[in-house]
Amino acid sequence: MQKLNFMERSDFNGRSEVVKELFGKSDGACVTPPFYCDYGSYIEVGKNFFANYNCTILDVAKVTIGDNCFMAPNVAIYTAGHPIYPDVRSAMWEYGKEVTFGDNVWIGGNTVICPGVHIGSNVIIGAGSVVTKDIPDWAVAAGNPCKVLRMITEDDKRRLFRDEEIDDEAWAEICQKLGW
């Protein structure tokens, strides 16, 4: 991890090799330093994983991230927790709960994912969210605590943002690339 954090930003091949060492594979993974984790060996990422600046993954339990998942700057994924009762907590007890992401997940900046959370496939989590509970497939969710705001539908295919459609030329190119 230290090696990754001190590499030249332009050394994409070197960063890819370090990511492969850290996660056991890279397969199109890109991690923009600085990046922090407890071990790295409990983190499994799918194809085309992207973590922007200052990603923190406390991996005392397994973290499984699907294909095509993107994390904006300052995303934190926590698997570690501590007992509620003060005397037990002060004895330095810790537990870990797995965190999982499906495929095609986009996590907005400054978001915290708490221990034990499962985020489904094709999900967007809005910036600044604190995710304390599972999020179903095809959801747009945000807030503190994070809640489902709406579901992603076919109507969203041509949308860049809520009220802005992709122009016809770009749409034709997208359809061609996707084989639609």
Per-range role (PLM):
Residues 1-28, 146-180:
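Terminal amphipathic alpha-helical/low-complexity segments used for targeting or macromolecular assembly
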Residues 35-45, 50-118, 144-145, 150-153, ...:
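Flexible, glycine/small-residue-enriched loop-and-beta-strand segment within the central core
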Residues 106, 124, 140-142:
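Short-chain dehydrogenase/reductase
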Residues 108-134:
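Beta-rich strand-turn-strand
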Residues 135-137, 142-145:
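Acidic, glycine-centered active-site loop in nucleotide-sugar glycosyltransferases
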